[in-house]
Amino acid sequence: MHAKRPSVLFFTISDFGYVNVVLATIYELLLRDEVDIHIASFAPLKPRLESLVQLVKHETKKSTDSSPGVHFHNLADFPGFATWAAQSKDRKKADVPHPPGRNGAGRVALLTLKALAIMEPEQYLSLFDWSADLTRKLNPALVMVDPILLPCHDMARTLGRKYAVLHPWSVADGLIPRQGWWSEYWKYPAFSTGFPYPLPWGKIPENISCYLTSKQCHSHPKVQALNQARYSHGIKPDPLGSFTPFAEGVPQITPSLPAVDLPMGNIPKNVFDCGPILVASPPIETSDPDLLSWLRRAPTVLVSLGTHFEAYAETVREQAIGIRILLEARPDVQVLWKLKREATSEKSGQENLESILGQAIQDGRVRTESWLKADPVAILRSGHIVCSVHHGGANSYFEATWAGVPQIVLAMWYDTFDYATRVEYLGIGAYGNREKGRSCVVDEDNYVAPNLVDGEEFGAALLRVVGRNRADPGAAQITKSAVILGEVCRRSGGRVRSAEIVTGLCFGKLDY
């Protein structure tokens, strides 16, 4: 290691897709080898970091002693972690989905409250103190914080440290209110509505209602109590952030680009759009040669609804119906389906799958996997994927956009509805469950996650994007638009640009 080099300290959670922007940036920082790298996160991230370091050593052909490394600090060491983890352990991923718009606004407000009041005051302040002690000990030139760890934002700001936010998603929700003329009410779809852009006039009343409902949590007693505890602890008197905390004068590094987002004229200097910040991944030829052999058989639709999605039997049935509609119309197409079933309905889900797609599975036209060995980016860039069906997660959206592959979004929660809006606005795919999602009504007092997929609607979206035949002009135009946008993304810099910004901030060579 070089003496007296500046260091950067990352604070991040370890969720698989969410943390990819951090891993991608660290990969490039390791290749540059100009700064020392520390990361505070949870234990599941450590093996991925170790693999990343080994990949860089292999690529640079440096010896173990001379290779740069990453210093890992276990975020679970803060004293309040055990209590916090115990409170969160019973949450089921399959119960997260909610409708868009008016019918889901109450649920969005509740989930936003949980994001703001992410911990009880005692735990929040415990993480604040722990991260402050670590920062004082390491004295990094730069602190990098992910959007969710609000105590670490507070720490960096209160200690007066130079810090930046590395986002896995667009910061549009933080920028839209800056566009003027109250356009967040009448022009831009409110968070989690899935409304088209520009907003249709008839949707304005519901849009305003959803926008205001999502803000109500800021006055909730839990948030008020946490704010009081923060201020009493000496934390600078700024209100809690949001899903996309936007702070004046704090660099915001994002995987977005103007070309892949909703149009906004007022973008501050401290927002650095890098384009998709994707992890370095081995080609599919080495990571899963068996899958590559199967992909080479026919044009393939990739169905993968994200790390956190677990499908109840009813959802499995409706997805299977949509896939069957495509296969019946397009005998030249096959489907790779990453399917993770919800545990209590796994048997009935399997029965639904076999009754609807049993023959196609036997014939090898449908391949189901609970996990994909190859990285999604490697699969998307194999040249064999004609459509990516995903849940609208930011990571999935940016991966498919970068790869130049048409998309269908089966939106499930939070901002996934917003990425469905982007896909349709940009002409690179379809919102595959708009009507079903809009028709769902839930009981807030006895909440049961609804099925948000209708097989017929999903099948129609597949035919629209993949085409009813090889010469379908509508599908050809969608593919053309996706390919053009992919070329823009791949020229944008992505993880290289993100690492350049981090390095520039460490050395004080970047204006913002």
Curated annotation (Swiss-Prot):
Disulfide bond positions: none
Broadest EC class assigned to this enzyme: transferase
Q: What is its EC number?
A: 2.4.1.353
Question: Do the record's keywords include Signal?
Answer: yes
Catalytic activity reported: sordaricin + GDP-6-deoxy-alpha-D-altrose = 4'-O-demethylsordarin + GDP + H(+)
The biological process GO terms on file are: antibiotic biosynthetic process
Which residue positions carry a glycan here? 207
Family annotation (PANTHER family):
EG:EG0003.4 PROTEIN-RELATED, FI06409P-RELATED
Q: Give the function comment from the record.
A: Glycosyltransferase; part of the gene cluster that mediates the biosynthesis of sordarin and hypoxysordarin, glycoside antibiotics with a unique tetracyclic diterpene aglycone structure. First, the geranylgeranyl diphosphate synthase sdnC constructs GGDP from farnesyl diphosphate and isopentenyl diphosphate. The diterpene cyclase sdnA then catalyzes the cyclization of GGDP to afford cycloaraneosene.
* Protein name (database record): Glycosyltransferase sdnJ
Task: State the organism's lineage.
Answer: Eukaryota, Fungi, Dikarya, Ascomycota, Pezizomycotina
Q: Which gene encodes it?
A: sdnJ
